[in-house]
């Protein structure tokens, strides 16, 4: 299959699945992990691969990605044994504001509430285990159905708490744009 240039593709798995040209930046995963920082701010000019880098990190660490081994098989991170063993072992929340283009405050709030509702719905399986009180399950479904948009302020923190209870591991949160 002829390799193509992946213009505009910001999803690591799509680039790998399409066998598109890719400059291996997986060494960033090791550098970032070994830094031990609680918070990392990635600043680069537009079109410098920030979103693709976040996608790569998310897909490397995420418990929910099924083909991690295959995606990263021919990359530099495969050679870093102490980091390689961490692949697919963390809950990951990923949020992007790139589609939030509203100019009115109330519309912006509703749009963000919708994005967070999508994230909550992806993790609906959390409500099936006995890790939440009935009140917490109500809270979860209120966020998932956008019934309480004013609660979005603490919703990511609450979701990360639920994920921590479920997996017993700290949660990686990626926020883009």
Regions found by a protein language model. Name each.
Residues 38, 91, 168-172:
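Loop/turn-to-beta-strand initiation segments
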């Amino acid at each position: 299959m002829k390799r193509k240039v992946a213009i505009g593709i910001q999803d690591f798995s799509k680039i790998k699945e399409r066998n598109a040209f890719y400059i291996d930046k997986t060494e960033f995963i090791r550098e970032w992990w070994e830094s031990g920082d609680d918070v990392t701010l990635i600043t680069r000019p537009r079109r410098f691969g920030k979103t693709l880098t976040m996608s790569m990190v998310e897909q490397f660490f995420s418990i929910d990605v099924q083909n991690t081994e295959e995606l990263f098989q021919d990359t530099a991170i495969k050679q870093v044994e102490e980091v390689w063993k961490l692949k697919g072992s963390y809950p990951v929340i990923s949020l992007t504001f790139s589609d939030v283009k509203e100019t009115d405050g109330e519309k912006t709030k509703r749009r963000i509430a919708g994005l967070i509702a999508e994230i909550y719905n992806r993790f609906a399986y959390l409500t099936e285990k006995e890790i939440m009180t009935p009140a917490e399950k109500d809270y979860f479904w209120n966020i998932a159905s956008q019934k309480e948009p004013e609660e979005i302020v603490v919703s990511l923190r609450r979701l990360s708490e639920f994920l921590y209870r479920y997996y017993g591991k700290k949660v990686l949160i990626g926020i883009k744009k």
